[in-house]
């Protein structure tokens, strides 16, 4: 009887460990509820679509490929099913793209700036994330987060955002890993070379925070996600600072860097 109990306990421990490990395959562990006050969720027709980043009380930065008609933006959200008491909702008042025709590629101009229909108030779970003051440094440890699938290729979408730490690589690593990428690009390359941690479907537009600075946001990556030697590609915020700041200042004819 004692032996049976010991074996049963070992089995429970094994299953518990396996479950925790599977949760780390794509998006990491559940984010601390207080670490993502700037993270927003983009919805279309009641369905979660993408992430984004609040950069001041009236503006959100995300990926151009996340654009949809009749979008709703949720701020201060942690659980999709259990709202925070200070959760707020907005819709876009205006959307801005690098190209008036919304032309973008996997390596260029996948960026959208959204002006909210009314400003949001800072609260327990809502606060903007500052734009970067310095360029990103290769070798940095970066934080990723989002409500995207935590398994791939089969998709499992969590109720709460997951967070993980990954590394910032030289762009040449992504250039060698993904066919079709040009020799240079205004994107960042980040991931874990041994695989197992990555952003994935549903994480698009969510932030890449390196050494505490908002350096990028999710653009695209390999399929399946989190494969060895296939880091993800992130739009580089620092290269678009002038365009972002000009648009916010009212210069809506500003152009993105070539």
Swiss-Prot record:
User: Where does the UniProt annotation place the signal sequence?
Assistant: 1-18
Alphabetically list the UniProt keywords. Answer: Disulfide bond, Glycoprotein, Hemostasis impairing toxin, Hydrolase, Protease, Secreted, Serine protease, Signal, Toxin, Zymogen
Compartments where located: Secreted
Q: Which PROSITE patterns match?
A: TRYPSIN_DOM, TRYPSIN_HIS, TRYPSIN_SER
Cite the record's tissue specificity text.
Expressed by the venom gland.
Q: Catalytic residues?
A: 65 (charge relay system), 110 (charge relay system), 204 (charge relay system)
Q: Which family does it belong to?
A: Belongs to the peptidase S1 family. Snake venom subfamily.
GO cellular-component terms in the record?
extracellular region; secretory granule
* EC supergroup of this enzyme: hydrolase
Annotated InterPro entries: Peptidase_S1_PA, Peptidase_S1_PA_chymotrypsin, Peptidase_S1A, Trypsin_dom, TRYPSIN_HIS, TRYPSIN_SER
Would you list which residues are glycosylated? 103, 121-122, 154, 170, 251
Q: Name the Gene Ontology biological process terms.
A: proteolysis
- Annotated disulfide bonds: 31-163, 50-66, 98-256, 142-210, 174-189, 200-225
Q: What does this protein do?
A: Snake venom serine protease that may act in the hemostasis system of the prey.
Oligomer and partners: Monomer.
Q: Which organism is it from?
A: Trimeresurus stejnegeri (Chinese green tree viper)
Write one Gene Ontology MF term.
serine-type endopeptidase activity
Q: Which residues form the propeptide?
A: 19-24
E.C. no: 3.4.21.-
Q: Which Gene3D superfamilies match?
A: Trypsin-like serine proteases
Can you say what this protein is called?
Answer: Snake venom serine protease KN12
């Amino acid at each position: 009887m004692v032996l049976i109990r010991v074996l049963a306990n070992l089995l429970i421990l094994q299953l518990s460990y396996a479950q925790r490990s599977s949760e780390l395959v794509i998006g990491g562990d559940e984010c601390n509820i207080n670490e993502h006050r700037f993270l927003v969720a983009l919805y279309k027709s009641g369905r979660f679509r993408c992430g984004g980043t609040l950069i001041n009380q009236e503006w959100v930065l995300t990926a151009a490929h996340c654009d949809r008609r009749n979008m709703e933006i949720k701020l201060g959200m942690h659980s999709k099913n259990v709202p925070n008491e200070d959760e707020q909702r907005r819709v876009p008042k205006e959307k801005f793209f690098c190209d008036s025709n919304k032309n973008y590629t996997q390596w260029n101009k996948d960026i959208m700036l959204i002006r909210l229909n009314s400003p949001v108030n800072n609260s327990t779970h809502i606060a903007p994330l500052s734009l970067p003051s310095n360029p990103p440094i290769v070798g940095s440890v970066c934080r990723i987060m989002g409500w995207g699938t935590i398994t791939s290729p089969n998709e499992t979408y969590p109720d709460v955002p997951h967070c993980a730490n990954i590394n910032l690589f030289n762009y040449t690593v992504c250039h060698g890993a993904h066919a079709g990428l040009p020799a240079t690009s205004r994107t960042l390359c980040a991931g874990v070379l041994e695989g197992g941690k990555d952003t994935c479907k549903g994480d698009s537009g969510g932030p890449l925070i390196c050494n505490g600075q908002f350096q990028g946001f999710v653009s695209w990556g390999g399929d399946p996600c989190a494969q060895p030697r296939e880091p993800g590609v992130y739009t580089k915020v620092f290269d678009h600072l002038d365009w972002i700041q000009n648009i916010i200042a009212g210069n809506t004819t500003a152009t993105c860097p070539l």
